[in-house]
């Protein structure tokens, strides 16, 4: 008798996606982060749902409702900090996932890669709106500064900003709509993830060597399910250590002060995972130029398949491009540090140099290195 998982219409889909899926036999732990992102997304939706049961999206009570969750709701403090730090874990996994895609040339599966970029934008939008909800000082001023960037759009900018605000400043209407969008977007992300996986299973997974692995496939279960479970345990260990020992490590102390439109904080900055993009935005003196650079800092990823000049897909056997890749990683860490610093010398010039290096490395140096490596191989 045929196993039900292979015949049942619904179970058959799950079977082909997570059980009998043919996977390359040599994929390393860097391939764990896709499943970890799935766990993070589920965790965020579950904790977010419980928080939404007690949260009120009104400017007069939003801050108090978050305090009420932490003080009066059973394990409310745990749910709140799991949600806040879960977002940080989500972005750590996201950055590693994208970094792995860049290192091993996974961007050559163009549909999967482009879907991933759309997902990245959706997650960033969700995280930004979530940061506004506690209605602390940094929530309010972060929302004001970031939404104000749209006013740089010629002709329609100011009208667009006021339309998003629902008035002439960030107020009750803004908070209510941000809560509505923050609630619905994760479910849209789940749908996009399904499309992402659909595209992935059309071509199959890439592997560290960058070579075709059709000749050497193994079933996903039990080999990679057990490997993913180990990754999940390590992720939860790290997350729980963060939540139970230093829950405010990655937050901003200013957000424990209720929002006050009459008092601007000395340094307005977003959460740590947006600092690299914020540094690129600030490094250009022109407002519209800064906004374009901000968007391009993520959109540049869509150009990677077209900038690939090497005959080899992966960087595994390409030492020159490998060096440039790690320079890029160091550059992004520098930008993250600069984004959290005040706008003064020497941080301004460091930010500008790091921003230039970011775009030059991706758009010019890495494609050139690919061609040089190919020529060296021809000569030997």
Swiss-Prot record:
Cofactor(s) of this protein: heme b
Binding site for a ubiquinone: 201
Localization of this protein: Mitochondrion inner membrane
Binding site for heme b b562: 83, 182
Binding annotation for heme b b566: 97, 196
One Gene Ontology term, aspect cellular component: mitochondrial inner membrane
Protein name as annotated: Cytochrome b
The organism of origin for this protein: Voalavo gymnocaudus
């Amino acid at each position: 008798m045929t196993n039900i998982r292979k015949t049942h219409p619904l179970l058959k889909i799950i079977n082909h996606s997570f059980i009998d899926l043919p996977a390359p036999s040599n994929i390393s732990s860097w391939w764990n982060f896709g499943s970890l992102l799935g766990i993070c997304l589920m965790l965020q939706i579950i904790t977010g749902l419980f928080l939404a049961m007690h949260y009120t999206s009104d400017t007069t009570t939003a801050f108090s409702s978050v305090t009420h969750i932490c003080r009066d709701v059973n394990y409310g403090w745990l749910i709140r900090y799991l949600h806040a730090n879960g977002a940080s874990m989500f972005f750590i996994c996201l950055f590693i996932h994208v970094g792995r895609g860049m290192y091993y040339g996974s961007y050559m599966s163009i549909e999967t890669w482009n879907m991933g970029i759309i997902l990245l934008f959706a997650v960033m939008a969700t995280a930004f709106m979530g940061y506004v909800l506690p209605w602390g000082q940094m929530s309010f001023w972060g929302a004001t500064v970031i939404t104000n960037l749209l006013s740089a759009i010629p002709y329609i900018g100011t009208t667009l900003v006021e339309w998003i605000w629902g008035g002439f400043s960030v107020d009750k209407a803004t908070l209510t709509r941000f809560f509505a969008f923050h609630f619905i977007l994760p479910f849209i992300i789940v749908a996009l993830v399904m499309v992402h996986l659909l595209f992935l299973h059309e071509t199959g997974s890439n592997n560290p060597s960058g070579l075709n692995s059709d000749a050497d496939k193994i079933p996903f279960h039990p080999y990679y399910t057990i490997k993913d479970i180990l990754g999940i345990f390590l992720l939860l260990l790290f997350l729980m250590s963060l939540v139970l020992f230093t829950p405010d490590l990655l937050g901003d102390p200013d957000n424990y002060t209720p929002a006050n439109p009459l008092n601007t904080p000395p340094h307005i900055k977003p959460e740590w995972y947006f600092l690299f993009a914020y540094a690129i935005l600030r490094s250009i003196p022109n407002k519209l130029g800064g906004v374009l650079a901000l968007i391009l800092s993520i959109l540049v990823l869509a150009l990677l398949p077209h900038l690939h000049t090497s005959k080899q897909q992966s960087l595994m056997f390409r030492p020159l491009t490998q060096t440039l890749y790690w320079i890029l990683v160091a550059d992004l860490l520098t930008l993250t540090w600069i984004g959290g610093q005040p706008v003064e010398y020497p941080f301004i010039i460091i930010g500008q140099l790091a921003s230039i290096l970011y775009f030059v490395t991706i758009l010019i140096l890495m494609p050139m290195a690919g061609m040089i490596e190919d020529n060296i191989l021809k000569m030997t």
